[in-house]
Structure formats: C-alpha cells, structure tokens
Amino acid sequence: MPLLNEVARQRAIIYRWFSQLLFQELSDEGLLRLRDKENLALLNALKLIPELSLLVTHFQRRLRAMLKREECRLELAADFASLFLLPAPSGVSPYAGHYPHTNSPEERQALRQKLVEHRLAPQNNEAVDHIAIQLALMTALIEEGVEREQQDLFLNRHLLSWLPLCTKRCYQRDRFGFYAAAMGLLTGFVQQDSEWLIACRLATHPARPGQS
C-alpha cells in the first residue's frame, strides 16, 4: 500500500466513517464511537470547510438530540429501519439502482468486479450499489493511491448521480432527522471532495490557451 499523505488519510477516514454510519443499525459500540473525541475532531475538521459548516452544525444538533433519547440505540435502530429498510413511499432506498440517471447493468457489473478486486464484495446478498458499500470502495481507492482523476470519475458516476435525490427524500421522510442530517452532510462532503479533485487536476495539468 502506498504511503498516504495527510490529506488522503483524512479523506479515507471520512469516507469510512460515513460507510460505517450508513451500513446498518448502529450497535452500542457504534453509539459510543459517536460520543468519543475522535468523532468530535472529525466533525470539527469538516466544519472548517466553509461550504460544510452549516451542514456539520445541523448534524451535531441532531446527534446531541439523538443521544438524549431515553432508549437512543433502539430508537435510532427504528429510525434506520423505517427510513432505509421500508419500501417507497414510506422509506428511502439506499441503492443507486433505484434512482434515475444512474449506472447501466454493465457499469454495475464493473463495480462488482472492483469490489471483488478490493475484497469488498458483500457476503450477505447485499447489492453492490448500496451507499455504504460504494463509500467503502471509495475509501479503498484513496488508500491504494488511485489516480485522482479516477477517484473523481467514481464519485460522479457512482455517488453524485443519485445522492442529492436520495438526500432530498431523506429530509422529507426522516421524522427525527438524524439520518437525514447525516445524508445531507455526506452529499455536501462528496460535492466538495469532487471539486477539490478537479482543482488538483487543473493545478497539475493546466489547460493550454484555446482549450476549454
């Protein structure tokens, strides 16, 4: 594995954090991690990005409110199930293939092959286009030092093509608001990450006069 610079390391940590948050109902251990200093430091780091400041603040408010619930783990598990496990129109699908303008069957097969190559293929019949699995693959691409152009291509083909619509539906249907706030922050981060990758590419390979 290549030696990661600090920016790449932090990006991988953030994508892994979102993947773990959205994969399934949080365990007691998962809830404890949301309270720890590392989680606080991660959110504070994201808050330093101006475009994410309000999204982080909103997520922190929903997180604090969630942790004050009497049976917070059980109630949060119920929130997760009612939002992501129920079919539409009650729930919101966390699968890319359920949204328009996403990938073709051939591209989904290529995605499955990538997951096999990175030893991330789901073992429990989970579809490869689940949001958490795609975020885990993005983490692996960063950690393996895949070219930034390919990382941005992955973000746009497999995440940004459907995340905004998914997030909009979460805001409409998540009654408590914790997971909607998490999805809003995720979408904002992915958009900013894509813009950063583009800026890095332009700085490395500036357009020549006359090129668009």
Curated annotation (Swiss-Prot):
Its main location: cytoplasm. The keyword Cytoplasm applies. GO terms for biological process: protein folding. Pfam families: Nitrate_red_del. Keywords: Chaperone, Cytoplasm. GO terms for cellular component: cytoplasm. The keyword Amino-acid biosynthesis does not apply. InterPro entries: Chaperone_TorD, DMSO/NO3_reduct_chaperone, TorD-like_sf, TorD/DmsD_chaperones. It is found in: Cytoplasm. Gene3D superfamilies: TorD-like. SUPFAM superfamilies: TorD-like. Involved in the biogenesis of TorA. Acts on TorA before the insertion of the molybdenum cofactor and, as a result, probably favors a conformation of the apoenzyme that is competent for acquiring the cofactor. Belongs to the TorD/DmsD family. TorD subfamily. This is Chaperone protein TorD. It comes from Serratia proteamaculans (strain 568). The lineage of its organism: Bacteria, Pseudomonadati, Pseudomonadota, Gammaproteobacteria, Enterobacterales.
